[in-house]
Amino acid sequence: MAVKSLSNSILTPLQKKNRKQIQVWLYSILLLCLAIVLVGGATRLTGSGLSITEWKPIHGVIPPIGVEQWQEEFLKYQQIAQYKMLNRDMTLSAFKVIFWWEWAHRVLGRLVGLVALLGLIWFWAIKHIEKNVLLQLIIVPILIAFQGVVGWWMVASGIGQSNLTSVSQYRLAFHLITACFVIIFVTYLSQGLAEYSEKPASHRVQYFAGWLVVLILIEVYFGALVAGLHAGKVYNTWPLMDGQFIPDGLLQHDPIWLNLFENPLTVQFVHRFFAYILFFVAIIHAFYVQKNIPHSIHARRAFFICVMIAVQALLGIITLLQEVPISLGLIHQSVALAILCFSVAHWRATKGAYRAIE
């Protein structure tokens, strides 16, 4: 029998109630994901990411207890290149500080996975999930589990026999981008269950809003490469780099494409100038939406995205000039996540809510 679709405007009171409950659950997942990324940023900025050298998905929740267990954990850390090359004078007390950052990051990851899985089981059991969103909701805990595997794959690049004193910038960037995919997916899904007073925008506006999200994600990716290469610690001037608008040495690696991933100068250059491009595209998008849907909520959201990107650019400049202190680095990352979430919400709003299934 064919499934009949109903518009969002004629949702039954029960459907509205069920959707709001699922939204609350998805928002809790989203907040936990944002917290994980921010704690992960602090873990990276404090050099704590390699402090736990084993992956124990179940038993890893329990931290060391007593001096003997702490000494054992510290001894494991002393076997990796980061300790041998950078931290030979580290004390047990100092080790505990970096350990707790990484431990908190991992425990939050387990918590969000648990919230996603148990919530899915609960809402499915009480039949609150509409057929047209069931598959998307099943994907949420799968994406989170995959992200956990990627996290360990990233950490593995800096332990064992590795000569790296930090994780691979490639794996770090991939880890952040997969986290962003989870955030995008959960935001998009939750906003698809929202109620909207305005009508969906034209398909062209929808496509433009979607591509803006893609550009923001690309900028986040290059920001992750900047972090992985510690590229924010060099060329701490603006608007020029080393006294030049286009500095020498952008293409010093062979093959040329390698500069986009392993040359700190090139990576910072691309991150800077892609931000200018992103801001320009966001302005065009805002005026395009205003032209097509004058004085609409869609248009106001589009202009607010421009404001957020401008604020983020200013924060980026200040963070660079200050040589990336931990506080500014985390604020810069937080605003990036806020822009990503808001742009996804804007994109979903241009499409309207999911139609209900009768």
Curated annotation (Swiss-Prot):
Cysteines engaged in disulfide bonds, as pairs: none
GO terms under biological process: heme A biosynthetic process
Keyword Nucleotide-binding set for record: no
Membrane-protein topology: Multi-pass membrane protein
Keywords: Cell membrane, Heme biosynthesis, Iron, Membrane, Metal-binding, Oxidoreductase, Transmembrane, Transmembrane helix
EC number annotated for this UniProt entry: 1.17.99.9
Pathway assigned to this chain's UniProt record: Porphyrin-containing compound metabolism; heme A biosynthesis; heme A from heme O: step 1/1
Amino-acid positions noted as binding heme in the UniProt annotation, renumbered to this chain: H271, H332
Catalytic activity, reaction form: Fe(II)-heme o + 2 A + H2O = Fe(II)-heme a + 2 AH2
HAMAP family assigned: HemeA_synth_type2
Protein name: Heme A synthase
Subcellular location as annotated: Cell membrane
Family statement: Belongs to the COX15/CtaA family. Type 2 subfamily.
A cellular-component GO term for this protein: plasma membrane
Cofactor requirement: heme b
Superkingdom: Bacteria
Primary location recorded for the protein, binned into one broad class: membrane
Molecular function, one GO term: oxidoreductase activity, acting on NAD(P)H, heme protein as acceptor
Residue ranges crossing the lipid bilayer per the database entry: 22-42, 107-127, 133-153, 172-192, 208-228, 269-289, 302-322, 324-344
Entry function: Catalyzes the conversion of heme O to heme A by two successive hydroxylations of the methyl group at C8. The first hydroxylation forms heme I, the second hydroxylation results in an unstable dihydroxymethyl group, which spontaneously dehydrates, resulting in the formyl group of heme A.
